[in-house]
Curated annotation (Swiss-Prot):
Subcellular location field: Cytoplasm
GO term, biological process aspect, one: defense response
Matches recorded under PANTHER family: OS08G0374000 PROTEIN-RELATED, STRESS-INDUCED PROTEIN SAM22
Function of the molecule: May be a general steroid carrier protein.
Outcome of mutating residue 61 to S: Slightly reduced interaction with BV16
Gene3D superfamilies to which the protein is assigned, alphabetical: 3.30.530.20
Protein known as: Major pollen allergen Bet v 1-A
Coiled coil regions, renumbered to chain: none
Gene Ontology terms for molecular function: abscisic acid binding; protein phosphatase inhibitor activity; signaling receptor activity
Highest taxon of the lineage: Eukaryota
Organism for this UniProt entry: Betula pendula (European white birch)
Family the entry assigns: Belongs to the BetVI family.
SUPFAM superfamilies according to UniProt: Bet v1-like
Gene: BETVIA
Amino acid sequence: MGVFNYETETTSVIPAARLFKAFILDGDNLFPKVAPQAISSVENIEGNGGPGTIKKISFPEGFPFKYVKDRVDEVDHTNFKYNYSVIEGGPIGDTLEKISNEIKIVATPDGGSILKISNKYHTKGDHEVKAEQVKASKEMGETLLRAVESYLLAHSDAYN
């Protein structure tokens, strides 16, 4: 098994605490509402949202795969940090065991925030991660972030 780590950062004009509430804590409800072209539904299969919770994320028609199942590994409300692993569906299969993801939202001096994202692809055997998998994951994250950001800018009273 190999582990391939990819890190990225992206900025937002939304303050860290507000973005954490919307993007992380209520993303299950918000994503299908603000980005139905990316996520059609999120179903809580097991747990209460904390570590150990299993969620099924379903994608719309025409997507390369129908769903993924995520396991919540950590939710740190104080440091705006969220860790989860993709454990089933989507790219998980013959070549990938799981994908571990860490999202940390850091406040910036101008009142916005930086999302620091780390993706660890745990491969089976000597398989390598394809560049298009990493690109697709980054694009999905960016799509969701910008949709949530637009929603929050249009609804200044939400998630305060």
